[in-house]
């Protein structure tokens, strides 16, 4: 909108107009006004100061007392005027200059008017007196004249109103003066037609009072649109325009011209994409505008804009094919590497797709789903892909496509490079589980299924076995079938057995070790009839024992009377109490924490681990980035947590406890545990490496760079991970954006399980009561958890609502700079965080649902995932934003806009609004005072180097707040 002061200054040059209703100065014939009595006023001819003939009225009965001489004009039509102005030109004789006066000499006369709906006045009607005539004023001269002087003309202007009837008469009363009424001009004032700020305002008559303001509605000039409504100006009593309300700016495709009085079309080759005060701009690179008034420049042939790119963005093209493709075949896998295309299309978002085709003779078809790609098949960011699970001795053709953000706009398939390979002979895969088909004192009968991928003809199977605990004294036998009977075994002995297959390419991997036991020698000699009762009795006793154990466990759970030793076993049994659902087991219920680590975490040999650099510090020690290289697996980056030297046993237990927790989880949105190192120093926990680090800092570094759909996708991933945890009866207790990690593909994963605890399943709303004195992250924690230290999945839902707010505000601190106590007080008074800038209403409503005081009314994580899926499918619902509190039952906190006057310099102001990184940009460009900063536009920000859209929006909003504060504190000149 145009600033109000600017519009007023533009209008100040437009002078008010006067329109005459009657003027005796130009009358040359008789005026024929009515005089009473006949001996009073008389009409005479004379000359004005320019020697022009005029008709005047005069009276000079000063020698007679009790004078009451009246003069009335003809009927004057009102013409919709509410206030009338009368200009009187007259002369008055100085009474002292008249000799021998016997009467009462006056030097004034009275001025009246009378309203009427028609020209109905007569010589005796209305009565010649005040009321019905309405007195306007007593007219006194500024100067009178004597006999020696020439007549000195006085000019007086009087006004009266409001008048509402069809017309009026003017009347003059003489009470004994020597007066000459030279001319009478009757007129009214009006504000002239004007155009300013791309708006036209009609000619407007002033109001009924001198102080009246008459509203004149405005209309935008052609090709301009209203910025705010209503569009109007006020006409004051002097016929001057003032107090503009609303404004217009040129529409998209048009720019200002004629000193803001017209909008002209953009010329060919230029465009203007948005309504506003800006000028037309040359078309961006690789685009054109072939007609005038263009709002966007269309891309030239072969160039495109991606979805979401603005009209200001240059058009780009698809990349050329990848170059220098290298293939490295290893049996039934291949590693493909390539160099980037020679032409990237003017973009930096190049991705790669690897299309696999299996060729039989001359016919090639798409590979089946068994073929695996690492890291993935489509949308690969790095220039290396490993393809495995190919068939042996088979020809394959791989197309490596290069795509970017505009490839989907091109009608052509992406450019690609083709490489053909032939796989080698490979050894068979491992044998599935080995099973027992009979056990005697001196023999075992076993069977197994063939390998899933034989990769050729199976020649035979090798069976390796040894008595448990005597791995060095093993034996092997071979079999050409999938069964074997092994003789010469020791009675009542446990044997460990492994099987592997052999082809012409060699042996495959051994199966997983299985344990089988031969029976006692007496049992071997027993007859089948003797064994049946024993078997039946054993089975019956076993069933009774299992039922008894289950009943005991259920009773113990319901009464909560488990002791420490019982807890270890009953919690493990939970995995079997809920069909199809794996429940979390608290590692702190183990008497020996090392047993929990062995159960849930994989031990990794220290020789497989290489620490590269320290990237941070944790509660127990340093956090490092490193590499993990295990046999048969590709080298991978990992995050390594180390336990500092001089630790206590309790610290070691707590440190490894987090690994025991993570090892129980298997979900794409939960951080994955790779293993632990406990047999050497330092003790380590290895997890997958997340390239983009913590979510809060990642969002702050990429402020404004994601679409709403992408942000909702991030929220959906976090909710999916929390749904998985809640279904395992697991409470996180410390869910916050700082504890969400982001990988290179923007997949978010829940991490940091240091504060988490097991969630009991003995009632519908399980809780955990923390130890007194435990640290609680106030800004993310539900009120019941703060007050009573009770944590539930519902309190995790509250924390998830705060995470939603962090994501939509690009990592802003919840509750800003409020103290923890102020946060607690605000929540207790039912205040909730307002929607972040440009946050869709549906997302803020979901946040408010997560922050309901009654935890039983908060949504479950499964419901949150479902709600986010619906929003993603219906993207239109994400375009509705709610700037206010309409429809919101909770009160919303209001972050006060910092007053610029409290900051001594522009640099201090930038620091206060978290934009301190641009101090040098502002100062170098000359924006060193608040007066200059308040005039900045989006083009100015772009010119000084503020290129991030989110930062531009934040700065422009702060500049707008500064303008508002200036308008409220500085006087406006009218």
Swiss-Prot record:
Q: What is this protein called?
A: Ephrin type-B receptor 3
What are the TM regions of this chain, as residue ranges?
535-555
Annotated Fibronectin type-III domain ranges read 318-426, 427-522
Residues carrying a glycan: 330, 420
Q: Any idea where this protein resides?
A: Cell membrane; Cell projection, Dendrite
Disulphide-bonded residues: 60-178
Q: Assembly and interactions?
A: Heterotetramer upon binding of the ligand. The heterotetramer is composed of an ephrin dimer and a receptor dimer. Oligomerization is probably required to induce biological responses.
Q: Which gene encodes it?
A: ephb3
Protein function: Receptor tyrosine kinase which binds promiscuously transmembrane ephrin-B family ligands residing on adjacent cells, leading to contact-dependent bidirectional signaling into neighboring cells. The signaling pathway downstream of the receptor is referred to as forward signaling while the signaling pathway downstream of the ephrin ligand is referred to as reverse signaling. Generally has an overlapping and redundant function with EPHB2. Like EPHB2, functions in axon guidance during development.
Domain Protein kinase residues, every copy = 609-872
Q: Where is the signal peptide?
A: 1-16
Q: Which family does it belong to?
A: Belongs to the protein kinase superfamily. Tyr protein kinase family. Ephrin receptor subfamily.
Q: At which positions is ATP bound? A: 615-623, 641
Q: Where in this chain does the record put each Eph LBD domain?
A: 18-196
Name the catalytic site residues: 734
Q: In which tissues is it expressed?
A: Expressed in the embryo in pre-somitic mesoderm, caudal somites, midbrain, and cement gland. Most abundant in adult brain, eye, heart, lung and ovary. Lower levels in intestine, kidney, oviduct and pharynx.
Q: Which residues form the SAM domain?
A: 901-965
Q: Which UniProt keywords apply?
A: ATP-binding, Cell membrane, Cell projection, Developmental protein, Disulfide bond, Glycoprotein, Kinase, Membrane, Neurogenesis, Nucleotide-binding, Phosphoprotein, Receptor, Repeat, Signal, Transferase, Transmembrane, Transmembrane helix, Tyrosine-protein kinase
- InterPro entries registered for this protein in UniProt: Eph_TM (IPR027936), Ephrin_rcpt_lig-bd_dom (IPR001090), Ephrin_rcpt_TKs (IPR050449), FN3_dom (IPR003961), FN3_sf (IPR036116), Galactose-bd-like_sf (IPR008979), Growth_fac_rcpt_cys_sf (IPR009030), Ig-like_fold (IPR013783)
Q: What EC number(s) does this enzyme carry?
A: 2.7.10.1
- Name its species: Xenopus laevis
């Amino acid at each position: 909108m145009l600033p109000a002061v600017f519009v007023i200054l533009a209008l100040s040059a437009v002078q008010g107009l006067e329109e005459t209703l009657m003027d005796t100065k130009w009358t040359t014939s008789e005026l024929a006004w009515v005089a009473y009595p006949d001996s009073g006023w008389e009409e005479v001819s004379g000359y004005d100061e320019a020697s022009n003939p005029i008709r005047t009225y005069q009276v000079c009965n000063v020698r007679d007392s009790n004078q009451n001489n009246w003069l009335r004009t003809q009927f004057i039509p009102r013409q919709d005027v509410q206030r009338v102005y009368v200009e009187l030109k007259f002369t008055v004789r100085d009474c002292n200059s008249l000799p021998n006066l016997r009467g009462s000499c006056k030097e004034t006369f009275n001025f009246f008017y009378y309203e009427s709906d028609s020209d109905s006045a007569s010589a005796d009607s209305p009565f010649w007196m005040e009321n019905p005539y309405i007195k306007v004023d007593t007219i006194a001269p500024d100067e009178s004249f004597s006999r020696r002087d020439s007549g000195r003309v006085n000019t007086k202007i009087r006004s009266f109103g409001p008048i509402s009837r069809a017309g009026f008469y003017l009347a003059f009363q003489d009470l004994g003066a020597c007066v000459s009424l030279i001319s009478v001009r009757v007129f009214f004032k009006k504000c002239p037609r004007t155009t300013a700020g791309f708006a036209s305002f009609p000619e407007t008559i002033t109001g009924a009072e001198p102080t009246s303001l008459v509203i004149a509605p405005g209309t935008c000039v052609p090709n301009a649109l209203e910025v705010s409504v209503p569009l109007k100006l006020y006409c004051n009593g002097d016929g001057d325009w003032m107090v503009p309300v609303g404004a217009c700016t040129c529409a998209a495709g048009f720019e200002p011209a004629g000193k803001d009085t017209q909008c002209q079309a953009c010329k060919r080759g230029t465009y203007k994409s948005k309504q506003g005060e800006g000028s037309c701009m040359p078309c961006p690179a690789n685009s054109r505008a072939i007609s005038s008034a263009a709002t966007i420049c269309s891309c030239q042939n072969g160039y495109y804009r991606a979805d979401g790119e603005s009209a200001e963005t240059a058009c780009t093209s698809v990349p050329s094919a990848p170059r220098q493709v290298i293939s490295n075949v290893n049996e039934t896998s291949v590693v493909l590497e390539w160099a980037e295309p020679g032409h990237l299309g003017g973009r930096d978002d190049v991705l790669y797709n690897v299309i696999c085709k299996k060729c039989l003779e001359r016919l090639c078809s798409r590979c089946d789903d068994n073929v695996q790609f690492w890291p993935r098949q489509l949308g690969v960011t790095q220039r290396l892909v490993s393809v495995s699970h190919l068939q042996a001795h088979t020809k394959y053709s791989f197309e490596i496509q290069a795509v970017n953000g505009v490839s989907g706009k091109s009608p052509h398939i992406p450019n690609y490079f083709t490489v053909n390979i032939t796989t080698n002979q490979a050894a068979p895969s491992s044998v599935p589980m080995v099973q027992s088909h009979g056990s005697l004192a001196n023999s075992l009968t076993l069977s197994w299924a063939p390998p899933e991928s034989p990769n050729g003809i199976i020649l035979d199977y090798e069976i390796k076995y040894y008595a448990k605990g005597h791995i060095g004294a093993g034996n092997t036998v071979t079999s050409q079938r999938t069964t074997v009977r092994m003789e010469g075994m020791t009675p009542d002995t446990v044997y460990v057995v492994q099987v592997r297959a052999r082809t012409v390419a060699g042996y495959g991997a051994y199966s997983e070790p299985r344990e089988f036991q031969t029976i006692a020698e007496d049992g071997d000699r027993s007859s089948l009839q003797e064994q049946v009762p024993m078997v039946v009795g054993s089975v019956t006793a076993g069933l009774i024992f299992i039922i008894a154990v289950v009943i005991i466990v259920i009773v113990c759970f319901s009464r909560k009377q488990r002791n420490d030793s019982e807890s270890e076993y009953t919690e493990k049994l939970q995995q079997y109490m809920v069909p199809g659902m794996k429940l979390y087991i608290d590692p702190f219920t183990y008497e020996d924490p090392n047993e929990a680590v062995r159960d849930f975490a994989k031990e990794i040999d220290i020789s497989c681990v290489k620490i590269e650099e320290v990237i941070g510090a944790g509660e127990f020690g340093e956090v490092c980035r490193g590499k993990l290289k295990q046999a048969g697996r590709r080298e991978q980056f990992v995050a390594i947590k180390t336990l500092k030297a001089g630790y206590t046993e309790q610290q070691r237990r707590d440190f490894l406890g987090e690994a025991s927790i993570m090892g129980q989880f298997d979900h794409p949105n939960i951080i994955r545990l790779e293993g632990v190192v406990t047999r050497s120093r330092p003790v380590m926990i290895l997890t997958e490496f997340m390239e983009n680090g913590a979510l809060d800092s990642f969002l702050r570094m990429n402020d404004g760079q994601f679409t709403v759909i992408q942000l909702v996708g991030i929220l959906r991933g976090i909710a999916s991970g929390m749904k998985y945890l809640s279904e395992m009866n697991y409470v996180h207790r410390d869910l916050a954006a700082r504890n969400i990690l982001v990988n290179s593909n923007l997949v978010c994963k829940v991490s940091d399980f240091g504060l988490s605890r097991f969630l009991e399943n003995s009632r519908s709303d399980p809780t955990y009561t923390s130890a007194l004195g435990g640290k609680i992250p106030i800004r993310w924690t539900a009120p019941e958890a703060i007050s009573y230290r009770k944590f539930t999945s519902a309190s995790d839902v509250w924390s998830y609502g705060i995470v939603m707010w962090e994501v939509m505000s690009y990592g802003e601190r919840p509750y800003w700079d409020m103290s923890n106590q102020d946060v607690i007080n605000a929540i207790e008074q039912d205040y909730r965080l307002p929607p972040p800038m440009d946050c869709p209403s549906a997302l803020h409503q979901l946040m408010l649902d997560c922050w309901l005081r009654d935890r039983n009314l908060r949504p479950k994580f499964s419901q949150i995932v479902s709600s986010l899926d619906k929003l993603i499918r219906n993207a239109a619902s994400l375009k509705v934003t709610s700037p206010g509190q309409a429809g919101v039952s909770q009160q919303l906190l209001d972050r006060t806009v910092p007053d610029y006057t409290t900051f001594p310099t522009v640099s201090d102001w930038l620091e206060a609004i978290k934009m301190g990184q641009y101090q040098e940009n502002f100062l170098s460009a000359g924006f060193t005072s608040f007066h200059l900063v308040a005039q900045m536009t989006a083009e100015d920000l772009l010119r000084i180097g503020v290129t991030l859209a989110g930062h531009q929006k934040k700065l422009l909003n702060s500049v707008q707040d500064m303008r508002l504060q200036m308008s409220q504190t500085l006087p406006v000149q009218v």
